[in-house]
């Protein structure tokens, strides 16, 4: 049968049922109990993310398709992050496109209108042609769906590492807006409701949930990849929002198809589904395939009988299939029938309560012997600043219609965070952050660090973080060293979100990200954070003669840094000091509201040097004195490329105000230099470094490698 269940799980369900499941029931159990759908190896830890917050309307405790947070004036935002890693490794265009479609349906399942998308892409070394092909088609898939459906892609991440050569990561986040009294659940609380299905069911995506719950084994798994249809997705979006008031619950058909959607929607009640009533894309489909098909652009609605005709009529206007396929029952049994014959009859609670697993762990935290960095400053500057992680992503953004719906306030690449306008007149900033290199060194500090970095990035546009979702991407959880990094990352994320009082309202866990030889990816947890602009919005601009102020203390902490990755420098990973991140962020927000700064950039990937380079690419030069850097090392390379947290580079015409404001908050700040008109010149301690070639690489690298690939 090709099941992905463990023997202990198969024995467990036999004992609960007191019988042997039939072949179709085994396939249903395999889907519902898959790691992808059940979180059986992670759910016990995810509960630690729960924070009681008066703003949370729908959070991690509710365990629904997306989270929702009150933003005032009767409005709420809905937020979700998802991935389509395994499908994108096999069919990158459809894998990425269906990832966009799926997360949009998660947002509209809450009755919310999607207003923004973000994509976070990680692929392997671009010297390998397959990775260029993967990236080009991943971007094309995201663009094709997002542009066609009319939801702007407002930002994201793009990074490269050999660890993703066979297993790219394709994450998509979405934000929606809804009146808070109009939010829809994905679950029901009463029997008698009719189950209405919109969309055709085909043979694509068969076994997708199980496919996503094991390591990749080859391109013969192409049948598990769903096919995208953005124009059908647009109909689903528009009609779902139109009929939201007429339905009791809305559920996207994602992983596991109807088997999972019906079971989860029933919420402890039962359901009867008549398979012959399901509209099919392919004639004479096997009923078992109909149950677990993951064909896209389908939605399931729980509807009062009196409203069924009106709901289906709305779809009929678009000639879109809509059918009553069953109903919610009081008996807690999930039944799939075919012309009156029960093919599946399983207790709801048995399906919703799979065995939970706590796998062995093995401490892999590294104890590193510190050594003095002995590198040529000139070659280090040129090598690090030329790294693909630091180049402009404008070629990628240019593929997306990021201004559709005219709500985008800060364009992709113009700041550290994306900003969109909301119906209540407020501005919402959004940012995603991950750091797999740091996570491979110290997953606990990395967990704290990615939360802190997202918080700092929002501060650079004048926003304060208020809500987050997470995506945890790891290898096989049964491997002790993998499970250890997973548990440690959760510990760090939980500690940081509690410190900042930012509730995680949802997320995703993606295990089994390994190549065909069983080598896991670097641990890659991801945080997507959103927050409201607190007063004034900062749109970065660079002006001649502005003072360069370094906010925060620099430490010799090179572990997990880009410098360490390139030059194999042994060093301890940075210790994330959350209090410093909070206080330095408050200084930046205050300075923005007082109109004291024109430019703000948090210091992260590539260290101080990369942040200064971000000024230079605006067509200016920068001169600094490393002796002015407040630090625990005199080594110039260490000061320029350390990735200690809690730091910002800001441009101002009132540097003393910044220094005094920082002092009043308990944070150090120093005036380290000035902006000048020496285009593309970085001057360090009176020595000029001509970065014209690096600047040209910054603007043209992706187009030359991918656009012509």
From Swiss-Prot:
The active site is at 36, 84 (proton acceptor). Pathway: Purine metabolism; IMP biosynthesis via de novo pathway; 5-amino-1-(5-phospho-D-ribosyl)imidazole from N(2)-formyl-N(1)-(5-phospho-D-ribosyl)glycinamide: step 1/2. InterPro entries: PRibForGlyAmidine_synth_PurL, PurL_linker, PurM-like_C_dom, PurM-like_C_sf, PurM-like_N, PurM-like_N_sf. Keywords: ATP-binding, Cytoplasm, Ligase, Magnesium, Metal-binding, Nucleotide-binding, Purine biosynthesis. Coiled coil: none annotated. The keyword Cytoplasm applies. GO terms for molecular function: ATP binding; magnesium ion binding; phosphoribosylformylglycinamidine synthase activity. It is found in: Cytoplasm. Mg(2+) 2 binds at residues 106, 252. GO terms for cellular component: cytoplasm. It comes from the Archaea. Its EC number is 6.3.5.3. SUPFAM superfamilies: PurM C-terminal domain-like, PurM N-terminal domain-like. Belongs to the FGAMS family. Part of the phosphoribosylformylglycinamidine synthase complex involved in the purines biosynthetic pathway. Catalyzes the ATP-dependent conversion of formylglycinamide ribonucleotide (FGAR) and glutamine to yield formylglycinamidine ribonucleotide (FGAM) and glutamate. The FGAM synthase complex is composed of three subunits. PurQ produces an ammonia molecule by converting glutamine to glutamate. PurL transfers the ammonia molecule to FGAR to form FGAM in an ATP-dependent manner. This is Phosphoribosylformylglycinamidine synthase subunit PurL. It comes from Saccharolobus islandicus (strain L.S.2.15 / Lassen #1) (Sulfolobus islandicus). The gene is purL.
